UniProtKB/Swiss-Prot annotation:
Region (IgE-binding): 108-117, 132-141
Organism: Fagopyrum tataricum (Tartarian buckwheat)
Region No IgE-binding, annotated ranges: 41-53, 68-81, 84-95, 97-105, 121-131
Protein name (database record): 2S seed storage albumin protein
Signal peptide positions on this chain: 1-22
Family according to the record: Belongs to the 2S seed storage albumins family.
Stretches of the chain forming a coiled coil according to its record: none
Protein role: Seed storage protein.
Length: 149
């Protein structure tokens, strides 16, 4: 029984550490090369965009750990759907170009913070957000290449 408690605690601590990086309550806009127009849009929509972080964190981490973290931190239990709705509000209010820049910033901010497997899953989830929000296909430009989200 003691071993189970130790393993459960260790797993929760690992999940808490990983989720912390995915759920930063703000965006580090200083390290990214975002246009001033998009920087303004991201700052204006930041409270809703943070919900995108939470949605992705809940999706890539085991929901049980995320729920436990929410309760420990006094946030109550909020559903993935609630975070997705808030995220969609922000993405629909922003110009496509700025959504693309924000998504790139999200990926850049997580590099080196989380493991490669979680990073790949997070990127996949991030690319699926526009579709989940009912936003038509977007053209994004990165490193001289065009790609569709």
């Amino acid at each position: 029984m003691k071993l189970f408690i130790i393993l459960a605690t260790a797993t929760l601590l690992i999940a808490a550490t990983q989720a912390k990086y995915l759920r930063d309550e703000g965006f580090d806009l200083g390290e990214t090369q975002m246009s001033s127009k998009c920087t303004r849009q991201v700052k204006m929509m930041e409270p809703e965009l943070v919900k995108c972080n939470r949605y992705i964190a809940m999706d890539i981490m085991d929901d049980k750990y995320e729920e436990a973290l929410s309760r420990i931190q006094g946030e109550g239990c909020e559903s993935e759907e609630k975070f997705l709705r808030g995220c969609c509000v922000a993405m629909k209010e922003m110009e496509d170009e700025c959504v693309c820049e924000w998504m790139k910033m999200m990926v850049e901010n997580q590099k080196g913070r989380i493991g490669e497997t979680l990073m790949r899953k997070g990127i996949r989830d991030l690319k699926e957000l526009p579709n989940k929000c009912g936003i038509s296909e977007m053209e994004c430009h990165s490193r001289g290449n065009w790609y569709y989200v």
